[in-house]
């Protein structure tokens, strides 16, 4: 059970992503506004 899973673009109830995020980057679970490479990815960037 990874708590850093990214939600779908429609379920992105996370606050704005970090500033060090690329363009099409969605916010992961409200886990300290973590950014993911793709809103469909399961790995989050710990930046």
From Swiss-Prot:
Q: In which tissues is it expressed?
A: Testis.
Which keywords has UniProt assigned to this entry? Answer: Chromosome, Developmental protein, Differentiation, DNA condensation, DNA-binding, Nucleosome core, Nucleus, Spermatogenesis
Q: Which InterPro entries match?
A: Protamine_P1
GO terms for molecular function, please? Answer: DNA binding
Q: Does the keyword Cytoplasm apply?
A: no
Query: Which function does this protein serve?
Result: Protamines substitute for histones in the chromatin of sperm during the haploid phase of spermatogenesis. They compact sperm DNA into a highly condensed, stable and inactive complex.
**Is NAD tagged as a keyword?**
no
Gene Ontology annotations for the cellular component aspect, listed alphabetically:
nucleosome; nucleus
Species of provenance: Orcinus orca
Compartments annotated for it: namely: Nucleus; Chromosome
Give the family from UniProt: Belongs to the protamine P1 family.
Q: Which taxonomic lineage does the organism of this UniProt entry have?
A: Eukaryota, Metazoa, Chordata, Craniata, Vertebrata
Q: Which GO terms describe its biological process?
A: chromosome condensation; sperm DNA condensation
Name of the protein described by the UniProt record? Sperm protamine P1
């Amino acid at each position: 059970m990874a708590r850093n899973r990214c939600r779908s673009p429609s379920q992105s109830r996370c606050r704005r992503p970090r500033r060090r995020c690329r363009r099409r980057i969605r916010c992961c679970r409200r886990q300290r506004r973590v950014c993911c490479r793709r809103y469909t990815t399961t790995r989050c960037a710990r930046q």
